[in-house]
Curated annotation (Swiss-Prot):
Name under which the protein is recorded: tRNA pseudouridine synthase A
Keywords linked to the UniProt accession: Isomerase, tRNA processing
Stored Pfam families: PseudoU_synth_1 (PF01416)
GO annotation, biological process: tRNA pseudouridine synthesis
Catalytic activity: uridine(38/39/40) in tRNA = pseudouridine(38/39/40) in tRNA
MF terms (GO), sorted A to Z: RNA binding; tRNA pseudouridine(38-40) synthase activity
EC number per UniProt: 5.4.99.12
TM region positions: none
Superkingdom as given in the UniProt entry: Bacteria
Top-tier EC class: isomerase
Chain sites annotated for binding substrate: 111
Length: 249
C-alpha cells in the first residue's frame, strides 16, 4: 500500500462536520466515496488531522489515506479535485512514508474566527462570518486575548460533557485585528490542540469583554476556577476556519 497526504479546503455550511456520521452529509464521506470510485470500487478510509464541527470551514485541513498502487500526486489531486463536490477543494496530494499519520504525528493548528461587526451586516457573508451588532472596544479585546497565550487548563472554555480528561493545552499565539475593508474582526489562535468548542467559547467571552459586559480580568478567573458558567456564550460555527496545520520535522 502507498500512503498519501492531502491538504484540502472546504465550505462547511452544508456539512454536518468533517467526520462521517449516519444520516448526515460529511466531508469524510464525500471524499471516501470519490476515492472508492478511483480505487475501482474498493473502499478507502481517510484519516483527518482535525474533526471540524457542523458549519465550520477549513482552509488547510490535512488527511491521509492508502491506495494499493503508486500514483502521480498531481494527477491524483486533479482527479480528486474534479470528482469531489464543489464545496471541497484538493490543494495538494503527495506520497508520504507509511508511518505518517495526519492526526497522531506531532503538529500544531492555526484557526481563524471572523466576526462581522458591520451595522447593517453583510448578508453575503452570513454563512462565513458570525455577526456581532453591538459596540466593541478593540483595545479591550487586545488586552484580554493575550491572557489566553501559554499553557493552561482550558476546562472553563470547553463544552460540558466532553470526554477528554486532560484539558491542558498550549496556545502559542492569540491575537485579534480589525479588517477595515470588510468591517470584520479577525481572531487568530495557534496551538498544539484545542478542546471541543474551545475557540468558539473563547471568542464568545472576548466579545462580551469588548462590549464591556465582562471585565478583562474575566479570562484569568475562568482559567483559575475552571468554570464554564463564568465564560461567555458559544460563538456560532460559521465564523470558524481551520486555517493551517504544521507538522514537526
Amino acid at each position: 500500500m502507498t500512503r498519501y497526504k492531502a491538504i484540502i479546503s472546504y465550505d462547511g455550511h452544508d456539512f454536518a462536520g468533517f467526520q462521517r456520521q449516519p444520516h448526515a452529509r460529511s466531508v469524510q464521506e464525500e471524499i471516501e466515496k470519490t476515492l472508492t470510485r478511483i480505487n475501482k470500487g474498493q473502499p478507502v478510509v481517510i484519516h483527518g488531522a482535525g474533526r471540524t464541527d457542523s458549519g465550520v470551514h477549513a482552509l488547510g485541513q490535512v488527511l491521509h489515506f492508502d491506495l494499493p498502487e503508486e500514483r502521480d500526486g498531481e494527477k491524483l489531486r486533479f482527479a480528486l479535485d474534479t470528482q469531489t463536490p464543489e464545496d471541497i477543494d484538493f490543494i495538494s496530494v503527495e506520497q508520504v512514508s507509511d508511518d505518517f499519520h495526519s492526526r497522531y504525528n506531532k503538529h500544531s493548528k492555526t484557526y481563524e474566527f471572523l466576526v462581522d461587526i458591520g451595522r447593517p451586516k453583510n448578508p453575503m457573508m452570513r454563512h462565513y462570518a458570525t455577526h456581532y451588532p453591538y459596540p466593541l472596544e478593540l483595545s479591550l479585546l487586545e488586552e484580554a486575548i493575550t491572557q489566553l497565550e501559554g499553557t493552561h487548563d482550558f476546562t472553563g472554555f470547553t463544552a460540558s460533557g466532553t470526554s477528554v480528561e486532560d484539558k491542558v493545552r498550549t496556545i502559542t499565539e492569540a491575537k485579534v485585528r480589525y479588517d477595515a475593508e470588510r468591517n470584520f474582526l479577525v481572531f487568530t489562535f495557534s496551538g498544539n490542540g484545542f478542546l471541543y468548542k474551545q475557540i468558539r467559547n473563547m471568542v464568545g467571552t472576548l466579545l462580551k469583554i469588548g462590549n464591556k459586559r465582562m471585565p478583562v480580568e474575566q479570562i484569568q478567573r475562568i482559567l483559575a476556577e475552571k468554570d464554564r458558567h463564568l465564560a461567555g456564550p458559544t460563538a456560532g460555527p460559521n465564523g470558524l476556519y481551520l486555517k493551517e496545520i504544521r507538522y514537526e520535522e
